[in-house]
């Protein structure tokens, strides 16, 4: 009999809480991540009022300097700590895979200056189409079709671009490059990006329609991902008959591996919370694990170095926490964490190598307090012990400390 019949893990994408011990090995625009501090700098520079996370104990997490506007609670309602990443990357896929128990010793590649000519030339030779070189860089998916869609409609060239994550995306107007052709090109791109010089997590077909000034992406997106290289705790749960529910891009991150119920993509953080709450309300969700990613912190505000927007986004999520808790059962466990940092006050536009917060809450808790500093994979080890399945590669359970 599990201690908690249902466990709900929410990843606040990129919400770091201070530079990690190995942050000197990770860089942004040539600047080491050693001074990065996503929550600390937002609190210091923009003011951060998150009363619900504060109540659980966010301000109690050990730091060299306290969060400027997030006080410590004398009687927190939950257990808190910070977690360190051991894997060699600071991207979304690496963070999530480690949270589920894997140690990634060969990180995926990200391309802040665009993909190498070797890759572009191979795609051109396979497809018989030229690639628009000016689009070959990290780009907003809507901006890239606004900027280069008209040219594609005239020339039939491919729009190949990337993001902060290890992905290659190909945007194609459905009237110019038919879907079956786009998918075939993406399948080829997948085949040449399984090893260096471009070891990528996903290839994404991004079809769109419309006229210049009024383009829109269609539902015909297709992801060509890679599955985790070893079984994660998601797989262990699914194999043992424990239901797993994914909300947001979780299913994409794991290529569907170990997911028994995909609740679908989400349009925003608030939509993600809505879907999570709908999941909590499911009458047949009697026992199991839900896994939610809220990406706006990272995609909309972190990479764009928008401190005030990031603050507002955190405060919007915090305001929904009582609603999440109201829909939890007495024997549910809520875990809130992150997958890496993305300090909106820092140099460059990339993720930052940071500790991440961990907040644990249950209506069943009799106690509260600060847990020892741990590692990302401790989350999956705790989930595994709770449901009586094996852990994955790494992780130490803190289940016995949740009382």
UniProtKB/Swiss-Prot annotation:
Q: Where does it localize?
A: Cytoplasm
Can you name one GO molecular function term for this protein? manganese ion binding
Pathway membership, UniProt = Carbohydrate degradation; 2-deoxy-D-ribose 1-phosphate degradation; D-glyceraldehyde 3-phosphate and acetaldehyde from 2-deoxy-alpha-D-ribose 1-phosphate: step 1/2
User: What residues does Mn(2+) 2 bind to?
Assistant: 298, 303, 351
- Return the Pfam families for the record: Metalloenzyme (PF01676)
Q: Which note does the record give on the cofactor?
A: Binds 2 manganese ions.
**What's the catalysed reaction?**
2-deoxy-alpha-D-ribose 1-phosphate = 2-deoxy-D-ribose 5-phosphate; alpha-D-ribose 1-phosphate = D-ribose 5-phosphate
Q: Does the keyword Nucleus apply?
A: no
Keyword tags = Cytoplasm, Isomerase, Manganese, Metal-binding
Top EC class for this record: isomerase
Q: State where Mn(2+) 1 binds.
A: 13, 339-340
GO BP, one annotated term: metabolic compound salvage
Q: Name one GO cellular component term.
A: cytosol
The family database entries (InterPro entries) matched by this protein are listed as:
Alkaline_phosphatase_core_sf, DeoB, Metalloenzyme, Phosphopentomutase_DeoB_cap_sf
Please give the cofactor(s) recorded in the UniProt entry for this protein: Mn(2+)
- What is the predominant subcellular site recorded for this chain? cytoplasm
What are its E.C. numbers?
5.4.2.7
What does the UniProt function comment say about this protein? Answer: Isomerase that catalyzes the conversion of deoxy-ribose 1-phosphate (dRib-1-P) and ribose 1-phosphate (Rib-1-P) to deoxy-ribose 5-phosphate (dRib-5-P) and ribose 5-phosphate (Rib-5-P), respectively.
Q: Which family does it belong to?
A: Belongs to the phosphopentomutase family.
Name under which the protein is recorded: Phosphopentomutase
Q: Which gene encodes it?
A: deoB
């Amino acid at each position: 009999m599990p201690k908690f019949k249902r466990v709900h893990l929410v990843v606040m994408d990129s919400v770091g809480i201070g530079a990690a011990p190995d942050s000197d090995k990770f860089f942004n625009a040539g600047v080491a991540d050693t001074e990065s501090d996503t929550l600390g700098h937002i609190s210091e520079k923009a003011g951060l009022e998150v009363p619900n996370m504060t109540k659980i104990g966010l301000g109690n997490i050990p730091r060299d300097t306290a969060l400027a506007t997030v006080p410590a609670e004398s009687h927190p309602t939950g257990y808190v700590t910070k977690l360190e990443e051991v894997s060699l990357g600071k991207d979304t896929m690496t963070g999530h895979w480690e949270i589920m128990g894997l140690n990634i010793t060969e990180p995926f590649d990200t391309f802040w200056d665009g993909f190498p000519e070797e890759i572009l030339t191979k795609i051109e030779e396979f497809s018989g189409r030229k690639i628009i070189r000016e689009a070959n860089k990290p780009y907003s998916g809507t901006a890239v079709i606004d900027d280069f869609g008209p040219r594609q409609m005239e020339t039939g060239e491919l729009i190949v671009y990337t993001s902060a994550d290890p992905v290659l995306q190909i945007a194609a107007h459905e009237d110019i490059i038919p879907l079956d052709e786009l998918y075939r090109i993406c399948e080829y791109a997948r085949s040449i990006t399984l090893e260096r010089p471009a070891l990528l997590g996903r290839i994404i077909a991004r079809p769109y329609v419309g006229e210049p000034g009024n383009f829109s992406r269609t539902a015909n997106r297709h992801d060509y991902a890679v599955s985790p290289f070893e079984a994660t705790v998601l797989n262990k749960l699914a194999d043992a008959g424990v239901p797993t529910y994914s909300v947001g891009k979780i299913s994409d991150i794991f290529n569907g591996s170990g997911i028994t119920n995909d609740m679908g993509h989400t349009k925003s953080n608030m939509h993600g919370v809505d879907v999570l709450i709908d999941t909590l309300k499911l009458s047949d969700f009697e026992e199991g694990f839900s896994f939610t990613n809220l990406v706006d912190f990272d995609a909309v505000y972190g990479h764009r170095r928008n401190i005030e927007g990031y603050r507002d986004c955190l405060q919007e999520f915090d305001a929904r926490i009582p609603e999440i808790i109201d829909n939890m059962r007495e024997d549910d466990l809520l875990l809130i964490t992150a997958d890496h940092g993305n300090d909106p006050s820092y140099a460059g536009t990339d993720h930052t190598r940071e500790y991440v917060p961990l907040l644990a809450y249950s209506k069943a808790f009799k106690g509260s307090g600060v847990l020892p500093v741990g590692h990302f994979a401790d989350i999956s080890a705790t989930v595994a012990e709770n449901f009586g399945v094996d852990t994955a590669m790494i992780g130490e359970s803190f289940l016995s400390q949740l009382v």
